[in-house]
């Protein structure tokens, strides 16, 4: 006789076999019978909306809501007043008879995606991974949620996106929309999705962050859920690949005791109904075993230490369209031979992801400041088992000079180039030769557009950074500095947005008072630190300046995550180009200052030009993994004002007229 619990278990297993390829899809099957009056070529069909005008596709919140509800099994709760109001709406019915048939065919096409066997396998993989993160696979009573680092999430997304697209090529758009919803990354654009679908990805991560540890459950759940998948794992040492293989086998047997699991000849196999899923484990000293294989996923662990002969074998999988290669390694930079993957930073494809505690702009701080262990502009979320402080730095460097920066911090190959960037002749000419911009003889030849660049800083620490403001105009091929400010907040209790805007507006109005010939103001407000504050500063400037001086004022606009243009500018990789453009023009004598230069924040006893020359002298070049960057910060001197001048000149040179708009 069977016990009641056995009967329930058998019945549940039987039902799962019967409905293995079926799913309760919550797409509404009720035909939205509402007429639309426009040409047929403008009509589109959506399961939730029925027949609508094509411009509805550009209403992102509407389609985002439809996509989300399509993937959610529970019904949405609507409050009674809204439900009552919606029920009173009446729509004109469609007269044509074949419209409902078209709708049903379209609906069947949508629901077939959710019944696709491969989609169900992908969904089951994601569900199992969610359960593992929640601790459901552990036998202990106390379940602890596993917290993944961003790079681990990125690896998972890279893998599942590529496998989904290659396994479901005809339904690629549907599965990508579903995955973006599941991973809550619906904000990413198409170019970012293309990066996730690339055939090869490289992750360079500091030591002890769980690179190998994370790949073990990924392999386990892929073997369990994706039928017929073939996985390859290559390590730099035999004992590493053997350990990973045994750990994968152990976890598979513990997590999925009902599965038929075998481990033989360095291959782990999980048998499904009609096909097997396999994972092959090899070291770089025995890569002959991976030759002739057809992997869906090839993981290359500690790639920097893989033998060159083995690497050529691994690269042989690049032409295979169905193979995703994941290169994972530590960010070792003490030796060029064990950091060659950093060269991929110059690749036309964005395939390199580097996790570091220090950004490229502040890597020199590790050398300049004895106790510096973190980056000033990064907020580091490190695992609880990682502890980095000044004592760790001193101890590591006592054992081996440079070990802290190279082996622990994940610092890149960094060299501060001491070659002279600014010539002495250029500095002397900039200091002594200044134009009188209020002279009637020169005014007809001066540009009528004034570019103002504002780099806000929200701190009262004068040793850190302040707000840099620069006003730049043109004189033929030359650039003239009309005004500059280096402003520090008096108190954190003050309204920082209003204070910064007040400082900039005073300078702008003073420049306009002396130079009334300007007809247009083009203002660029950097929003890297705080985008909402940049928008507030723009609004205050617009209101303040337009009341006193009627000028055509435009602001540089950038699209935010909702694709809405906002009055701020995000400084990115163009900073290097801007600095190089500044250096070439400065040394050529094309950058001058006005004799009537305005500055309210630099001391009266201090010449503003001499003040900025001190920052220009500090400008130096930093080479990081063949990537060139520039910096002018020293322990006692910041570079905020210089950056504002450089970027104002660069924006004046670039033009980008379409990005400047009124607010």
Swiss-Prot record:
Motif position, Walker B motif: 297-302
Residues the record marks as active site: 302 (for atpase activity), 455 (for nuclease activity), 526 (for nuclease activity), 640 (for nuclease activity)
Keyword DNA-binding carried by entry: yes
Subcellular location(s) of the protein: Host nucleus
Name of one Pfam family that matches: DNA_pack_N
Quaternary structure annotation from Swiss-Prot or TrEMBL: Interacts with the terminase subunits TRM1 and TRM2. Interacts with portal protein.
Function: Component of the molecular motor that translocates viral genomic DNA in empty capsid during DNA packaging. Forms a tripartite terminase complex together with TRM1 and TRM2 in the host cytoplasm. Once the complex reaches the host nucleus, it interacts with the capsid portal vertex. This portal forms a ring in which genomic DNA is translocated into the capsid. TRM3 carries an RNase H-like nuclease activity that plays an important role for the cleavage of concatemeric viral DNA into unit length genomes.
Protein's name in the database: Tripartite terminase subunit 3
């Amino acid at each position: 006789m069977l016990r009641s619990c056995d009967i329930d278990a058998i019945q549940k297993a039987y039902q799962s076999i019967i409905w293995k390829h079926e799913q309760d899809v919550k797409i509404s099957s009720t035909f939205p019978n509402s007429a639309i009056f426009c040409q047929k070529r403008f009509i589109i069909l959506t399961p939730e909306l029925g027949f609508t005008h094509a411009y509805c596709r550009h209403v992102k919140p509407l389609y985002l809501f439809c996509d989300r509800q399509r993937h959610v099994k529970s019904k949405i709760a609507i409050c009674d007043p809204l439900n009552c109001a919606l029920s009173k709406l009446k729509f004109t019915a469609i007269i044509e008879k074949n419209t409902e048939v078209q709708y049903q065919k379209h609906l069947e096409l949508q629901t077939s995606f959710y019944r696709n066997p491969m989609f169900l396998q992908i969904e089951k993989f994601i569900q199992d991974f969610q359960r593992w993160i929640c601790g459901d696979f552990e036998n202990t009573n106390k379940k602890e949620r596993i917290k993944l680092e961003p790079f681990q999430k990125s690896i998972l997304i890279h893998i599942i996106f590529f496998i989904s697209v290659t396994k479901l090529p005809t339904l690629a758009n549907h599965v990508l929309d579903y995955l973006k919803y599941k991973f809550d990354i619906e904000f990413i654009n198409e170019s970012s999705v293309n990066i996730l679908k690339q055939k090869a990805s490289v992750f360079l991560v500091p030591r002890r962050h769980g690179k190998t540890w994370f790949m073990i459950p990924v392999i386990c759940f892929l073997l369990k859920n994706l039928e017929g998948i073939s996985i390859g794992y290559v390590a730099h040492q035999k004992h590493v690949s053997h350990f990973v293989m045994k750990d994968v086998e152990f976890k598979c047997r513990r997590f999925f005791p009902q599965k038929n699991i075998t481990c033989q000849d360095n291959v782990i196999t999980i048998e499904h109904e009609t096909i097997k899923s396999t994972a092959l484990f090899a070291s770089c000293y025995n890569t002959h075993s991976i030759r002739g294989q057809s992997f869906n996923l090839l993981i290359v662990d500690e790639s920097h230490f893989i033998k060159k002969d083995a690497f050529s074998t691994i690269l042989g999988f690049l032409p295979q369209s169905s193979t995703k290669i994941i290169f994972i390694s530590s960010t070792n930079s003490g030796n060029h031979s064990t950091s060659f993957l950093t060269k991929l930073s110059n690749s036309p494809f964005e395939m390199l992801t580097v996790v570091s505690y220090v950004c490229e702009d502040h890597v020199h701080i590790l050398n300049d400041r004895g106790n510096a262990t973190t980056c000033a502009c990064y907020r580091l979320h490190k695992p609880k088992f990682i502890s980095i402080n000044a004592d760790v730095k001193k101890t590591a460097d006592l054992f081996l000079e440079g070990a802290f920066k190279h082996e622990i911090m994940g610092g890149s190959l960094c060299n501060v180039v001491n070659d002279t960037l600014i010539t002495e002749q250029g500095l002397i000419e900039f200091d002594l030769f200044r134009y009188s911009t209020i002279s009637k003889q020169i005014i007809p030849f001066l540009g009528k557009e004034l570019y103002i660049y504002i780099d806000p800083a929200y701190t009262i620490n004068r040793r850190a950074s302040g707000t840099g403001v620069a006003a730049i105009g043109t004189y033929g091929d030359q650039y003239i500095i009309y005004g500059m400010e280096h402003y520090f907040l008096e108190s954190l209790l003050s309204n920082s947005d209003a204070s910064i805007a007040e400082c900039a507006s005073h300078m702008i109005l003073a420049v306009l008072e002396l130079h009334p010939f300007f007809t247009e103001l083009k203002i660029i407000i950097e929003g890297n630190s705080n985008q909402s504050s940049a928008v507030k500063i723009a609004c205050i400037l617009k209101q303040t300046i337009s009341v006193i001086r009627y000028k055509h004022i435009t602001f540089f606009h950038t699209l935010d995550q909702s694709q809405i243009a906002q009055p701020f500018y995000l400084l990115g990789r163009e900073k290097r180009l801007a600095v190089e453009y500044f250096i070439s023009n400065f040394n050529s004598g094309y950058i001058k200052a006005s004799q009537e230069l305005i500055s309210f924040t630099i001391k009266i006893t201090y010449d503003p030009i001499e003040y900025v020359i001190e920052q220009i002298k500090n400008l130096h070049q930093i080479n990081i993994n063949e990537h060139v960057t520039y910096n002018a910060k020293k322990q006692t001197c910041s570079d905020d004002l210089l950056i504002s001048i450089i970027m104002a000149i660069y924006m004046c040179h670039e033009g980008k007229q379409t990005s400047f708009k009124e607010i």
